[in-house]
Each structure stands twice: as C-alpha cells, then as structure tokens.
Amino acid sequence: MIDAEFKTALEQFGLELDEPLGMSLQQYAQSLWRYNEQINLTRHTTWDLFVTRDLRDCLQLAQLIQPGEEVLDMGSGNGVPGIPLAMLRPDIDVALAESVGKRAKVLDELVTELNLPVPVYAARGEDLLEDFRFTTIVSRAVGSLLKFCRWVEPHWSQFDRLLLIKGPKWVDERGEARHHGVLKGLELRVVATYPLGSVAPELAEAEEGDSPEAADASRGVILELTKKNKG
C-alpha cells in the first residue's frame, strides 16, 4: 500500500498516481532516504518535499518527452529527474551520468533494487557524448546555464535538445549566458512553468523574451534549448 503520509502529500498538492506507480515512487524515495544516511544525496527527506521538490519536476518533464526518446540525465546526483522519469515513462530509454563515484555506485544499486532498465555511467555527461548519442539531455541543479552550455557546446551533433529544470534564478542565468555569447546559434524557450507550493501543477508555454512570471520564487521552470539550424 501507498504510505499514508505520501498519499496525503499527493492529495494536498493536487496530484494523483495509480497504485503501482505510487508504490514504485515510494520505494525509490524510501531507498534514497536510507542511502542518504550513509552519503549526502538529498535534503528532501519528507513526503511533502519529495512531492513538491522532486516529483513535481519529474511529472512536468515527463510531459515534454516523446515515446521512444533516448534520454540522458546529466549529473544525476540522487537520481532526479532520471529515475522517477524512467518510472513515469516506461516507453522511453533513460540513462544516468554521475561523475562522483560514490554517488554513481548508489545510483547503480538503486536502479538494480528498483528493477529498472536504466544504465548508470560513472562519468561526466560530456565525456559520454564522445561515444553515445541521445535524443534529449535532461538535468536539474547542475551548474548555471552558462556552464552547462559550455560543457555541451562541442557535442551538439550527439543530441537534439536540452531540457533543463531551473528555479527563480533562471532569468539571471540567461542574462549571464547571453553576455558571454554561449546562446548564439541556440533557441531557448520556456516550455513549462509550475507552482512549487500548494497549488495543483499547470503547464504553460512561452517564447523567449516573454514576461518572466516564472521567475517567481514559488515556481519551477523547464527550459528547452535547441540548435537554430536543427529542424
């Protein structure tokens, strides 16, 4: 059964999951918290935080990916968004890249424990792109927009787009990235904004340059970056 506190958190924040999916996500969170006692992986160690800070990001991201896509979670850390994404979307292929060896080992143990067909690479994502191609790279809380664009700049032939989960500082990060010229030749769009408080999630689309309501501290944002010359 789904834990009563988990179910209450889902209901409180307007989210619904079927029983098998809820059980899988519950097992992931509980296993993650168990490993967290040995190695620092997450500060989101309550059901409320798991739902509002982890699950909501993944639910929004899952809506933006097409069936059959090959997705790399770059700098996976505690497995968010990659592991929940693999549970939410079994019709896609997800791989995790984590350069910190201890964390990569935990991620490998987690996906084995959860019986997920998710390879874990103890490597930097940009190094993986030397040998592997993906449809989409996803990431959360791994460097600024400037740093991320610099990391992947030599490897655009190895993937089609970036989907980056960001918080209220994304507008400042965009300004910094523009100042350093790393957005030249790229198209940046806000493809999702959603509340992180007690309001039910919503999906909104906007073109770059629109009024950045998403910069509000209570909202999450997903940015999509593509090459302008890509169809």
Curated annotation (Swiss-Prot):
Keywords in alphabetical order: Cytoplasm, Methyltransferase, rRNA processing, S-adenosyl-L-methionine, Transferase
Record field: transmembrane: none
SUPFAM superfamilies given in the database record: S-adenosyl-L-methionine-dependent methyltransferases
Name of the protein this chain belongs to: Ribosomal RNA small subunit methyltransferase G
Organism superkingdom: Bacteria
Region of interest called Disordered, as start-end residue ranges on this chain: 204-231
Location in or out of the cell: Cytoplasm
Annotated family: Belongs to the methyltransferase superfamily. RNA methyltransferase RsmG family.
Record-listed S-adenosyl-L-methionine binding positions: G75, G125, E126, R140
A GO term for molecular function: rRNA (guanine-N7-)-methyltransferase activity
EC number from the UniProt entry: 2.1.1.-
Record's function text: Specifically methylates the N7 position of a guanine in 16S rRNA.
Comp. bias (Acidic residues): 204-213
GO terms under cellular component: cytosol
Keyword Transcription regulation: no
EC category name: transferase
